[in-house]
Amino acid sequence: MMNTSLKTIKNMVDDIGFINHNLISINDLSNKMILELFKLANCLQPWYKSRLEILSGKHMATLFFQPSTRTRLSFETAMTRLGGTTISETTPLISSSAAKEESLSDMIKVVSQYANIIVLRHPNSDEAKNAVTYSDCPVISGAFGHEEHPTQALLDLYTLWQTYGKIEGLKVCIATPDLIHARTGHSMAYALARLGAKVYLLSKKEYRTPNFVMENIRKINNNTEEIFDLSQKQFNEFIYNNADVVYLPGCSAPKGEDAEKFKQIMNDYFVQYETIEKANKEKNKIIYVTHTLPRRKGEMDLRIDKSSAELYFKAIAYSVAIRMALVLAIIGFE
C-alpha cells in the first residue's frame, strides 16, 4: 500500500494529465500543466539525490545525435532516482546501426520496443519529428535542430518560479547575437509570453528570431519586443533599466573566416558585472543572470558566478527534480 507521500505524488501526476504524451515543443504543455509540473518537482525535490522506487522495472532510452552533458545526465539521473533504469546511445553515428545507414524512423521504432520512454536529441528537426511518429512509447525532445529545446526551458522556468514564486509580471531579456539558432531561446520565449512575462528579444538584426517563432509568440502575447544591434554600453544600459532577469540561451559560433566576426558581435552582448552591482547598490535590486550552459568565453563577467545574481549553477540543482516530474508525468505509475 502506498504511503501518504506516494499517494500525493500519484494524485499530482494524474492531475497533470500528460500520461503517454510526447513532449516535442514547450507548447505541448498547457500553462496549467507547466505550473502543476513545478509543484510536482517541488514535491520530488527531497529525493533528487536519493531514490524512490516508483518506476522500478521501467526503462529510459537516451539517444543523442549531438553532444550533451547536462540534458542527458540529468535525465538519466532522474530516471535512476525514480527507481528505473537507462540505456544510452551517445555516439549513434559511430556505434549504432545508424552507422550502417539505418533510418532514424527505424531506429526509433526498434528502440521503443526496449524502452518505456525515449529522450532524443537530433540535428534535423523534420527528421526527428517524423521519427517520433514511429515510436511505440512516448518521446521527449532533448532538442531538435534549431527549433526548440523544451526541457531546458522548463528547467529555467522552474528556476525562475523557485526564485520569484511566479512567472507572471517578470521582465526577462533573452539576449544573444544569434536568435535564429538559439533553440532554447525560442522555447523560453513561448513559455514566458504564455505565462504573462514581459519578454525582450535582443539580438543582431541579421540573426533575429525566426518569423514563424515571432508570429506564434505574438498570437500568445503581443507585448513581446525585439531589440536589435545594441552596443555593449547600450545593452548593459538596457538591462539596468528594464530587466528582472537576463537569460542567455547561448549560441554556436561559426567556424572558419566568420568566426572572428562573430566573436566581435558577441562582445556587444557581454553582461558586465558592474551593471549587476550598480542595480544592487542604486536600486536595491538583484538583476538575475542565467545561462543554458555551456557558456562561451566572452558572454559574461565571471565575477557574476560569485554574486547573488547567479542562477545558472543554481538551476543545476533543480534540473533532476523537474525532469523527474516530467518523466513521471509521462510514464505515470500505479
Language-model features: where?
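Positively charged, low-complexity intrinsically disordered leader regions
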Residues: 2-73
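Phosphate/diphosphate ligand-binding glycine-rich loop within oxidoreductases
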Residues: 53-161, 296-300
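Short, structured coil segments at secondary-structure junctions
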Residues: 82, 114, 134-136, 195, ...
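Phosphate-coordination loops involved in phosphoryl transfer and adenosine-cofactor binding
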Residues: 54-60, 168-170, 286
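Adenosine-phosphate binding glycine-rich loop
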Residues: 286-287, 292-334
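Rossmann-like adenosine-cofactor binding region
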Residues: 218-304
